[in-house]
């Protein structure tokens, strides 16, 4: 089965389950780390450095699996494992600030190959764009306008500061749907992280998983979610499948 056939099959399955006539895309809800920026390798280094310094045993690789969670949720996950409790408000804020500092020190701002082409394709087709990120780090978010000019209106951005529950909870993408003013069957989610793909699916959206994630594989995504090797191939293939 070709990629095109797999996409058509996924779309038909989604249409059937949602009892709609066609997949009429009006908005795209787009993750940031791992989709727009090749930044997860730096996030994992920063998380591992910070946690190791405070005596919490962990591996760098495990933070790829937490991609999409809020910083608070990630810290609480490791606190539960180490201490059997969640972190206090002051504790997690200080730890997250330290992690953010390390990310700035370690990280480089690298736009993901194909990201601009994907966004331009959306713009050309009149598809609304909403940024939905589990990050609260302004070190990358502040560059969105300069790196992707005109792609995201300021009022159409969801960050960790806008939600009470991060991915894999659907709240971030449900809020993204509100920002776009569309229902779930009129939006696609573009993700690279297992937890983000779960969140998009839970929000009821047709969710596209792209293979930039360190651990992303078919075992992590739902039946209608099709993997793509590059961002550039995503939208043209889908548009010709309706």
Segments the model singles out, each with a brief description of its role:
Residues 1-26, 120, 136-242:
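Asp-based, Mg2+/Mn2+-dependent phosphohydrolase catalytic module
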Residues 3-62:
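Active-site neighborhood of HAD-like aspartate-dependent phosphohydrolases
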Residues 13, 79-120, 125:
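Metal-dependent phosphoesterase signature
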Residues 35, 133-135:
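Conserved phosphate-coupling serine/threonine residues in phosphotransfer and NTP-handling enzymes
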Residues 36, 129, 189-190:
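Conserved SAM-binding loop
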Residues 45, 50-83, 105:
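Alpha-helical substrate-recognition element adjacent to the catalytic core
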Residues 52, 123, 201:
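Anion (oxyanion) recognition and catalysis
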Residues 53-56, 83-87, 148-153, 181-182:
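Short helix-capping segments at alpha-helix termini
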């Amino acid at each position: 089965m070709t990629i095109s056939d797999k996409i058509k099959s996924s779309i038909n399955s989604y249409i059937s389950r949602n009892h709609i006539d066609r997949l009429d895309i009006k908005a795209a809800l787009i993750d940031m780390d791992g989709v727009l920026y090749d930044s997860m390798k730096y996030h994992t280094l920063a998380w591992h450095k910070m946690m190791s310094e405070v005596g919490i045993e962990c591996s760098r690789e495990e933070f790829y699996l937490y991609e999409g969670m809020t910083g608070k949720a990630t810290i609480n996950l490791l606190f539960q494992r180490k201490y059997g409790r969640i972190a206090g408000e002051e504790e997690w804020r200080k730890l997250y600030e330290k992690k953010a500092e390390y990310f700035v020190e370690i990280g480089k701002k690298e736009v993901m190959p194909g990201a601009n082409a994907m966004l331009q394709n959306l713009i050309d087709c009149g598809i609304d764009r909403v940024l939905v990120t589990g990050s609260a780090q302004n070190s990358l978010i502040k560059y969105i306008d300069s790196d992707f000019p005109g792609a995201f209106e300021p009022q159409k951005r969801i960050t960790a500061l806008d939600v009470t529950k991060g991915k894999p909870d659907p709240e971030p993408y449900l809020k993204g749907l509100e920002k776009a003013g569309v229902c779930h069957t009129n939006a696609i989610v573009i993700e690279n992280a297992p937890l983000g793909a779960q969140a998009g699916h839970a929000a009821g959206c047709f969710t596209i998983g792209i293979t930039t994630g360190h651990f992303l594989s078919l075992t992590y995504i739902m039946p209608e979610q099709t993997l793509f090797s590059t961002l550039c191939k995503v939208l043209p293939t889908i548009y010709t499948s309706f």
